[in-house]
Amino acid sequence: MRKSLKKLLLLSCALGTVFSTSPTNLYAQSNTATVSHYIVTADNYQLPYDGEEKEFANGINPGYGSGLMFKSLNNDGSIEFYCVTDRGPNGDIPTYIKDGKAYPGKFFPTPKFTPSIGILKIDQNKAQIVDTIPLKDKNNHKISGKVIPFGAIGSTGEVALDFQMNDLGTDVNGLDTEGITRDKDGNFWLCDEYGPFLIKTDSNGKILEKYGPSMGLPSILAQRVPNRGFEGLTIDDDGNIVGIVQSPLDVDGKTSKTAPYTRIVKLNPQTKEVKMYAYPVDKNYKNFSNAKLGDITSIGNDEYLLIEQGKQNGKMQNLIYKVDLKNATTVDTNGDLEYGKVPQNFVPAKKELLLNLRQYGWNIEKAEGLAILPDRQTIAVVNDNDFGIAVKVDDANNNNASVEDYTYDADKKIFLNKNNQQVDIHIGLQQNAPEEQQSQIYLFKLNQKL
């Protein structure tokens, strides 16, 4: 393994560029990094798409960047990671009115998509997905990423539509997976931002256990902002499953913008005990709901690396923090944390800035997968490319049309513009921003071990 690691890191040094961080704190001052960057290809796993857009004639590019875990260093010097997709290609819909009520929702251009685990391999000058493991329910049937039924635990209240505005229905087992780790028995653990849920599967992706609000996890977690549930996952030295809630909870619909903390959740899979800790988000967001965590990975001794990102002072930031829970106090299962009602002895997680990815050439919005190599010096980060797609609207009378400009009346089956006038529009797919289209993996080799 040592020879394999040395070979890989020599390759990284040869391909990378050295950048220096600004003196933000002790870690940031003392660390520089050598950076290697790869486009992740998945030629054998393109998603079938029957739309007419020529950009997707060969299918939709998959996105396996919603979570990352180190897998192995191989004798030939190659390195492998486990990674995971989210719920699949999707995009925002116009305001959707049915029976006089407005609903949020998403377009699902590939509604039969199954959230899947991937194996990402870096070998010589390339990175590629070499295998996949689709997720399956307890009856061994493939699940989907479609929304959960209204009223069920984990429902976001959304409708799932195709581009003809047909309702695609729901999936009680639907998952929007966002993090991955593996236990000592070879079982995978995944997290999801619908529920939020923690999911245990066997090595073939079959679901064995599922935890959610009032289903083994505190009910307060149901008050996550819709689609902002668990965003990252790791396993600590004691075998506890550690998940992070993407953004501050919205308790009673009142706290998402004002609560300066989000939650770290620790589940003991043997005793089922759950502990929660407060993670202090940065202070320079327009409001705290703009803070988004990306992933977490354990570095031992109740210490972790964690991605925090979002616009601060008007500029997009993608930051890696070193987080210490050793002295952190647990928080209650009610909403007191979000309302600022903390006990006198309250101690949140300690955080220290390790890397500002933007200072190392990272120009992508979503850093969502994080892993550390056995050398404790090389950090891997992958992006969520949103499957390389975005929703487009063609309107002969509006050259800058976007879905937010329109309302769809499902009872009358008509589109209306902002002036409440009936319009004839066409909705379909286009490629998203050039810097976002590809799945990418960066290796940051620090100049000192963690």
Enumerate the language-model features and the residues they cover.
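Sec-dependent N-terminal signal peptides of Gram-positive bacterial secreted proteins and lipoproteins
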Residues: R2-A28
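Sequence/structural signature of beta-propeller domains
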Residues: Y27-L450
